Curated annotation (Swiss-Prot):
Gene Ontology biological process: apoptotic process; maturation of 5.8S rRNA; regulation of gene expression
Disulfides per UniProt: none
Tissues with expression: Ubiquitous. Expressed at very high levels in the hippocampus, medulla oblongata, mammary gland, thyroid and salivary gland. Expressed at high levels in the fetal; lung, liver and kidney. Expressed at low levels in skeletal muscle, appendix, heart, lung and colon.
Region spans: Interaction with NR1D1: 50-100
UniProt name for this protein: Nuclear nucleic acid-binding protein C1D
Modification after translation (UniProt): Phosphorylated by PRKDC.
Oligomeric and partner information: Monomer and homodimer. Interacts with NR1D1, THRA, THRB, NCOR1 and NCOR2. Associates with the RNA exosome complex. Interacts with EXOSC10; the interaction probably mediates the association with the nuclear form of the RNA exosome. The homodimeric form interacts with TSNAX following gamma-radiation. Interacts with RAC3.
Record organism: Homo sapiens (Human)
UniProt keyword terms in alphabetical order: Apoptosis, Cytoplasm, DNA-binding, Isopeptide bond, Nucleus, Phosphoprotein, Repressor, RNA-binding, rRNA processing, Transcription, Transcription regulation, Ubl conjugation
Name of the gene this protein is made from: C1D
Compartments (UniProt record): Nucleus; Cytoplasm; Nucleus, Nucleolus
Role noted for this protein: Plays a role in the recruitment of the RNA exosome complex to pre-rRNA to mediate the 3'-5' end processing of the 5.8S rRNA; this function may include MPHOSPH6. Can activate PRKDC not only in the presence of linear DNA but also in the presence of supercoiled DNA. Can induce apoptosis in a p53/TP53 dependent manner. May regulate the TRAX/TSN complex formation. Potentiates transcriptional repression by NR1D1 and THRB.
Source taxon at top rank: Eukaryota
């Protein structure tokens, strides 16, 4: 669109924005073609349940976001449309999945290893009796 002649149907000031919008739509179209090239069942069979939930949530969020953009292009305020509540609901579930993922990644305490580490890391001074016995043993040799 950069080499094309500017259409007089809209103000020149928004030409860059329209070009960027058109490029973004093209990128979304390519991404969706890639996602749609594999059947949903085929894709989900390869994933564990948490990954399946992520795919479902991203798909739902993408679809609703695209509807948001559609409403905006039609002159409808999407902030006053039920799609806003749907996007918020999906965002809440995405946060729940993120919390679960973070808990799985969090370090777990190995009590045995921690106990050995602390026991060996703490320095204990030898008692006076033990050092006298050690000195007597050295002098007799």
């Amino acid at each position: 669109m950069a080499g094309e002649e500017i259409n007089e149907d809209y103000p020149v000031e928004i030409h860059e924005y329209l070009s960027a919008f058109e490029n973004s739509i093209g990128a979304v179209d390519e991404m969706l073609k890639t996602m749609m090239s594999v059947s949903r069942n085929e894709l989900l069979q390869k994933l564990d349940p948490l990954e399946q939930a992520k795919v479902d949530l991203v798909s739902a969020y993408t679809l609703n976001s695209m509807f948001w953009v559609y409403l905006a292009t039609q002159g409808v305020n999407p902030k006053e449309h039920p799609v806003k509540q749907e996007l918020e609901r999906i965002r809440v579930y995405m946060n729940r999945v993120k919390e679960i993922t973070d808990k799985k990644k969090a370090g777990k305490l190995d009590r045995g290893a921690a106990s050995r580490f602390v026991k060996n890391a703490l320095w204990e001074p030898k008692s006076k009796n033990a050092s006298k016995v050690a000195n007597k043993g050295k002098s007799k040799s």
